Amino acid sequence: MAEVESFQLDHTKVLAPYVRLIGSETGPKGDVITNFDVRFVQPNANAIGMAALHTVEHSMASLIRDRIDGMIDFSPFGCQTGFHMIMWGEHSSEEIAKVIKSSLEELSSDEFGWDNVPGVAEKECGNYRNHSLFGAKEWSKKILAEGISTDPYERKVI
């Protein structure tokens, strides 16, 4: 079987929350994509509940695109501790961490309500009943309070 980078990561050594550059790849026509590990929760210590994670996913899909061009995808890890963020072009962990921090600040604000969360209707979402804005806001506040590091092994909070 092929080796998968994320399964080679020693999950006992990382210090979440952080943004980690997994790598960049160049396609056959020269296009570059960059993949990031956006880890919100310490692996094997906690997990974001599905309803909150789902609402974070939907909210961040829009909030990130408001702040930076070229986001291809922001997909949750099955372990519910964070997200893969895939971007067109080359980007640094510092640049992405600033975007993530700003997005979480807006999500956690009192002004951010259900009308700001995209894709929560039955025709827009395959599991539209499984959302929690309250949970998404609480997790966002917790992540921001802990600080987002640009290094997975040493706390370098932005």
UniProtKB/Swiss-Prot annotation:
InterPro entries: LuxS_sf, Metalloenz_LuxS/M16, S-ribosylhomocysteinase. Fe cation binds at residues 54, 58, 125. GO terms for molecular function: iron ion binding; S-ribosylhomocysteine lyase activity. It comes from the Bacteria. Its cofactor is Fe cation. Signal peptide: none annotated. It catalyses: S-(5-deoxy-D-ribos-5-yl)-L-homocysteine = (S)-4,5-dihydroxypentane-2,3-dione + L-homocysteine. Pfam families: LuxS (PF02664). Its EC number is 4.4.1.21. Keywords: Autoinducer synthesis, Iron, Lyase, Metal-binding, Quorum sensing. Binds 1 Fe cation per subunit. GO terms for biological process: quorum sensing. Involved in the synthesis of autoinducer 2 (AI-2) which is secreted by bacteria and is used to communicate both the cell density and the metabolic potential of the environment. The regulation of gene expression in response to changes in cell density is called quorum sensing. Catalyzes the transformation of S-ribosylhomocysteine (RHC) to homocysteine (HC) and 4,5-dihydroxy-2,3-pentadione (DPD). Homodimer. Belongs to the LuxS family. This is S-ribosylhomocysteine lyase. It comes from Lactococcus lactis subsp. cremoris (strain SK11). The gene is luxS.
